């Protein structure tokens, strides 16, 4: 519902033309996503790696932005990818704003409050795009914990006001989404996934242990296909011996193939001492891996 409210309805109201092609807002969302990646990496470096050079920042941000599968979403600009990209963009903007809030001095209350509220608004809007991505809201804990829990700022009057600014956007968006869900699907907690007009019955997909291992290997270690014409890489299909129906899509490689920066996870044991002195960073890494 959020992409419709942000793009489809305003476009129809201004032009009188229905059915805005998803490709147009997806291009804008892709640029906003890339901007958020650069902003997030900058704030993360400012907090945890203040001695990092500009070259290291640019290389990391460019690698993170280009390593995500935005290109795949733009390659298939349908309603399905539209919602995914919108949700991912809001997730990155939320994390960026929360890091900005954590890095903002407490004497700059207006800027601090704005970053907290805007970040929460973005994360709340994720539920109206791709509800599963709301799991990334857990990253607010290690980001904001040192200031508001460790330093006990939450127990002060100003801290309580900042907490209200953090919570209020979530409550307002949640009320709106729950009202919409109840009006359209009969329950405030039903986001309509079971009503998708798709190739399979969403209400009977079930959970099968036999599908876990092939899916994990495919989406982590899968590699793209190769062809003799530009761009030389092609999509491949998931191969499985599961004795049953497995709904799959074309993919261009798993996480480790599309995002080589993840190879750096192999060096985490070497950074144990540094991570030991940065508990919040260690928690962020663990939560990202879990999500």
What are these model-predicted stretches?
Residues 1-291:
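Membrane-proximal envelope and lipid/glycan-remodeling enzymes
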């Amino acid at each position: 519902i959020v992409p419709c409210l942000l793009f489809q309805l305003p476009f129809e109201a201004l032009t009188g033309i229905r059915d805005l092609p998803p490709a147009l807002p997806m291009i804008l969302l892709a640029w906003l996503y890339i901007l958020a990646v650069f902003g997030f990496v900058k704030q993360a470096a400012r907090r945890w790696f203040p001695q990092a050079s500009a070259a290291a920042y640019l290389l990391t941000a460019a690698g993170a932005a280009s390593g995500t599968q935005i290109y795949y979403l733009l390659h298939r600009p349908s309603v399905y990818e539209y919602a995914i990209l919108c949700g991912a963009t809001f997730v990155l903007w939320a994390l960026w704003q929360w890091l900005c809030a954590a890095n903002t001095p407490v004497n700059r209350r207006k800027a601090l409050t704005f970053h907290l509220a805007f970040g929460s608004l973005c994360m709340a809007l994720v539920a109206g795009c791709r509800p599963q991505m709301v799991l990334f809201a857990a990253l607010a804990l290690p980001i904001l914990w040192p200031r508001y829990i460790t330093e006990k700022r939450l127990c002060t009057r100003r801290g309580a006001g900042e907490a209200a600014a953090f919570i209020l956007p979530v409550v307002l968006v949640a009320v709106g989404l729950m009202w919409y869900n109840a009006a359209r699907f009969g329950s405030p907690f039903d986001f309509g996934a079971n009503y998708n007009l798709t190739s399979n019955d969403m209400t009977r997909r079930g959970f099968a242990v036999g599908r876990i291992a092939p899916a994990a290997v495919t989406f982590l270690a899968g590699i793209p296909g190769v062809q003799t014409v530009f761009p030389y890489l092609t999509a491949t299909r998931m191969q499985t011996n599961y004795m049953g129906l497995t709904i799959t899509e074309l993919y261009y490689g798993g996480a480790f193939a599309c995002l080589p920066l993840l190879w750096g996870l192999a060096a985490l044991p070497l950074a144990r001492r540094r991570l030991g002195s940065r508990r919040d960073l260690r928690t962020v890494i663990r939560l990202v891996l879990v999500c």
